Amino acid sequence: EAKTRNLVDEVGFIQIDGLMAGASPDGLIGDDGCLEIKCPEEQTHMGYLRLPQGKAPAEYVAQIQGQMWATGRAWCDFVSYNPSMPQGLQLCIRRVVRDDEFINKLHVAVVAFLAEVDAEEIELKNMLEAA
């Protein structure tokens, strides 16, 4: 908030309409943004500092896009903070915009995963009844 002058609203788990899935961003910003904060080790933080604006670390793309899907937000500020770094390098903010093509693929993958979970649950119930 101090760096960007954006007020952040805390939020809990947000369920995606019609699915047993959702996300829990670290905060919501205004009507259009959300927030994801990481506090990594120095080496990892340095890698994040090298990312171009608009890019998130590959390992967090699905999480960030999923948060925008769940919240309906247009962008997410990916924030990395490491207090051990020199002043001026402690905070890294990369604004990532919503990618509906990625979210559509994520939707397909989540629905497929939930179908697998449902099938496992049915199989386990049948096994329990047969025992």
Region spans (language model):
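Accessory terminal regions of nucleic-acid processing enzymes
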Residues: E1-A131
